[in-house]
A protein has these predicted regions:
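A compositional/biophysical signature of low hydrophobicity enriched in polar/charged and small residues
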Residues: 1-150
Length: 150
């Protein structure tokens, strides 16, 4: 989807201050309040803005560890395996990938015991032929928002 300058400015303003009022947003972008309302609604209807959420600090709520797991999955079982994995509340991302793995899974866990449980309960389900678990030691950058422009 092509975004014009006004759309880009609105998105950047919302990334900086997601709780900004519509009036503040319009002022920041330099457009009329009605225009801001119409543009925001349009961005939501087109799926550019998928929703509104809270950005939590995982460690502050007890998720001490993050793991990245590469999976090799039997041919013909990819979708079923991924759906089952995605249903686990500790899992926050499941990707189809190219390269050495068929899928990459990212999960947050509280401790080593939970890593053991996750490995035995989730990463050993039927259809997974091999898993490669990597524990994140330090996070340099993590963001759920990536603007589609410079």
């Amino acid at each position: 989807m092509d975004l014009d300058e006004v759309d880009r400015k609105m998105i950047l303003a919302l990334i900086e201050e997601p709780k900004a009022s519509l009036r503040t947003l319009a002022s920041e972008v330099g457009i009329a309040l009605g225009t801001a309302s119409v543009r925001l609604k349009s961005l939501q209807e087109k799926g550019v803005i998928r929703g509104w959420s809270v950005d939590l600090d995982p460690q502050a709520i007890g998720w001490e560890m993050c793991v990245i797991v590469g999976l090799r999955i039997e041919k013909g079982k990819m979708m079923d395996v991924q759906q089952r994995i995605a249903s686990d509340p500790r899992v926050f991302s499941v990707y189809d990938v190219t390269g050495d793995f068929d899928s990459i899974v990212m999960a947050r866990i509280r401790n080593r015991q939970e890593l053991n449980d996750l490995t035995k309960e989730v990463f050993s389900i039927d259809g997974i032929t091999r898993s490669f678990t990597h524990v994140v030691m330090n996070t340099v950058k993590e963001s759920t928002v990536t603007p589609p422009f410079e």
